[in-house]
A protein has these predicted regions:
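Active-site mouth loops of central-metabolism enzymes
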Residues: 13-26, 83-92, 175-186, 240-243, ...
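Conserved, mostly hydrophobic/aromatic
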Residues: 3, 36, 40, 71, ...
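Alpha-helix-loop-beta-strand connector modules within alpha/beta enzyme cores
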Residues: 55-81, 138-145, 336-350
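An alpha-helical appendage that flanks or caps ligand/catalytic pockets
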Residues: 5-9, 38, 125, 132-174, ...
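Acidic (Asp/Glu)-rich catalytic clusters
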Residues: 37-38, 68-77, 98, 102-109, ...
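N-terminal beta1-alpha1-beta2 module of alpha/beta enzyme domains
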Residues: 1-74, 174-179, 353
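Hydrophobic faces of well-ordered beta-strands that scaffold small-molecule active sites
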Residues: 3-5, 44-46, 80-84, 109-113, ...
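Short, acidic/polar
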Residues: 23-36, 94-97, 184-193, 301-312
C-alpha cells in the first residue's frame, strides 16, 4: 500500500469547522510536504480549483500548478499528483508546462485529470463550461494531445476541440512513455474513458466491499478496451479520524458532521449535485467532510484503522489519498501509529513465495 494525502490548498477539509489550524499558505504546505516524505508518505494530491470549495468561495485557496512547481524544487522523493481540468488548460501548453515541472522534480510529476463540475467558478474565470458527457468527449481528445506531445518529436492533431500543427515539445518528461495519469468518475462515460485512456482509477470513500466491486468492474472494462494495456492501478480517498478509543473517534465524527455549525462551505452544494453523476446520493452530512471521506470508514483506534486499510488492500487498492485535520499533527500520528501496523498486517501478502 502506498500512502498519499491531499495537500490542504483550501485550508482544511471540514465544511462545518471554519478554522482547522492549517492556513492555505505556501509556508504551511511547504513544511507539510517536506515533513511528509520524511515520515513515510509517498504522494501528495494537489487539487485544482480557483475558488475555495471547502471554506466558501470568498476564502483563500492556493493555485495547483504554481504550487506544484514550487514543491518540485523543495522536495526529494514525494510524488506530486496535480489535478488538471481540460477546460481550463489547452493541452499542448499544459503538456509543456507539466514536462518542465517533471524535469524540475526529477520525474515525480503525475496528473489527476478531472472534468469540471463547478459552473459558477467557470463563469467567474471566463472558461467554457461543457455539459457532462461533452466534458468527457473533450477530455478524451485532450488526453490524446497531451500524450502525443509527450511522445512524438513533432505532433499534429485536428479534432473537434483542439488543433495542433507540427508542434515540438522538448525536453520530454522524465517518465516514459509518459507520467502516470490518474482519473476518477462514476458515470459510464467517465469509467469507459478511464479504462481506455488512463493508468489508474481513483475512487471517493466507500466501504472495502463496494470498492472491490468497482475494482472488478474497472478491470473488466480495461480488458474490453484493449487487452494489451497494462493493468490499472486503484486509489481510494478517505478522511482519517484516529483516537485513543473508538468512542473518542466517534465523538469527533459527530462534531465535524454537525451541519448547523457553518453555512459558508455549503454555498456550492446544489451546483455540485447538479453537475455530477454519482452512483449514490450524498447527504449534507456526507458533504460536510470533503470527498465523502468518512465513507471509507477510517475512523477509530490505530489498530482499527490499520485493519480497515488491510481490507482495502485485499480489495485491490494500492494507494490511499488521505485527509486529516489538523493535518500536520494528525499525519505525524498516522505515520507513527498506523503505518507500522499496516506494514505488519500486509507483510504476508507481499512476501515472495519460497
Amino acid at each position: 500500500m502506498r500512502f498519499g494525502y491531499w495537500l490542504p490548498v483550501f485550508g482544511g477539509w471540514l465544511r462545518n469547522v471554519p478554522d482547522e489550524g492549517m492556513e492555505a499558505t505556501w509556508d504551511y504546505v511547504r513544511r507539510l510536504a517536506q515533513r511528509s516524505e520524511q515520515i513515510g508518505f509517498d504522494l501528495t494530491l494537489i487539487a485544482e480549483l480557483n475558488l475555495n470549495d471547502i471554506k466558501g468561495p470568498d476564502a483563500p485557496s492556493l493555485d495547483a500548478w504554481s504550487t506544484a512547481a514550487a514543491l518540485a524544487a523543495v522536495t526529494e522523493r514525494l510524488e506530486l499528483m496535480v489535478a488538471v481540468r481540460p477546460t481550463f488548460h489547452p493541452p499542448a501548453l499544459l503538456a509543456k508546462q507539466a514536462a518542465n515541472i517533471d524535469r524540475i522534480s526529477g520525474g515525480r510529476l503525475t496528473l489527476n485529470v478531472v472534468s469540471s463540475w463547478w459552473a459558477g467558478e467557470a463563469k467567474q474565470y471566463g472558461v467554457e463550461f461543457d455539459q457532462h458527457d461533452a466534458r468527457y468527449a473533450r477530455t478524451a481528445e485532450w488526453l490524446a494531445v497531451v500524450s502525443g506531445m509527450w511522445s512524438a518529436s513533432r505532433f499534429s492533431h485536428a479534432g473537434t476541440y483542439y488543433r495542433v500543427e507540427d508542434a515540438i515539445l522538448e525536453p520530454k518528461p522524465v517518465a516514459r512513455p509518459r507520467p502516470t495519469i490518474y482519473a476518477g468518475g462514476e458515470s459510464e462515460a467517465a469509467k469507459n474513458l478511464i479504462a481506455r485512456d488512463c493508468d489508474a482509477y481513483l475512487m471517493h470513500g466507500d466501504p472495502p466491499e463496494r470498492v472491490a466491486a468497482k475494482v472488478a468492474d474497472m478491470r473488466a472494462r480495461r480488458t474490453r478496451a484493449d487487452g494489451g494495456l497494462p493493468p490499472l492501478k486503484f486509489g481510494v480517498a478517505g478522511y482519517v479520524v484516529c483516537a485513543d478509543t473508538d468512542a473518542r473517534a466517534r465523538a469527533e465524527v459527530a462534531r465535524i458532521t454537525d451541519v448547523r455549525q457553518s453555512a459558508a462551505g455549503y454555498a456550492n452544494y446544489q451546483d455540485w449535485l447538479a453537475n455530477t453523476q454519482l452512483e449514490q446520493q450524498v447527504s449534507l452530512e456526507d458533504y460536510s467532510v470533503s470527498n465523502r471521506g468518512l465513507r471509507a470508514g477510517l475512523v477509530g483506534t490505530a489498530e482499527q484503522i490499520a485493519q480497515r486499510i488491510a481490507e482495502f488492500e485485499r480489495a485491490g487498492v494500492d494507494l490511499l489519498l488521505l485527509q486529516f485535520s489538523p493535518q500536520y499533527e494528525e499525519m505525524e500520528r498516522f505515520a507513527a501509529e498506523v503505518i507500522p501496523l499496516v506494514e505488519e498486517l500486509t507483510a504476508g501478502r507481499r512476501a515472495p513465495a519460497r
